[in-house]
């Protein structure tokens, strides 16, 4: 069954719900809305609402919760762009470029608080147990994502980051919000602990596959489709799985080519391209295989839930496959 109409309708509903709490005027609200209105796949709220629908949750409450995780995601993007000094996000100037760093920090703070306002709206009328579980789940996500971002920044000054450290970092920085989205969908539908555990497993493995694919796109993607400069991860010194594997497997000459450009914001285009070529040769196939492995783990977790077929279930299944084949 074609689920595109289901997805399109959900995106419209989530967008309207998010904007309903960000209708204020002036630079603060304009800056806060900028990232939200700048595009995005809305994967996290789609996961949350689809899970809730499958398990019999209330659509209106799921929409508020879905809007909450997307607004929280936008908060992290605004602050990440400041820390990484990124000039573009989805092909448009970042918030701090347009409004300055102080206003961008405030806009991120506002989005953070608005995510809690939205989850409170989702939880009205729910049992105290459900309220506490949902708030604990969302709060844990903020803590874990912050820890992941701190690790990502720490890794920029290291050349000895291991694959295990990388997986731990992306589990926290990226995959945690996918896991939180799936889990919150179950919490709102009052699913049992076994289902909640499997939903988290689906989300965490999906998120890891998503981030590995994102790292690959940073090396192989089209600049116009990505909406940011290619090789920006190399320039910023990001320890992606491609960099980690190549530094471990490469010859002294290959390592030197990588390290000349890695984290060097004044690197020439030729130096960046040379480093990218080495990464492609040494680690691209490995990264693709690793992304597929985590995609398959995500599918296994979903299958273990024994959920009924339908557009929502098909969306969750296809998402686990499509995240490793995307072009942007």
Stretches with model-predicted labels:
Residues 1-328:
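All-alpha prenyltransferase/terpene-synthase fold signal
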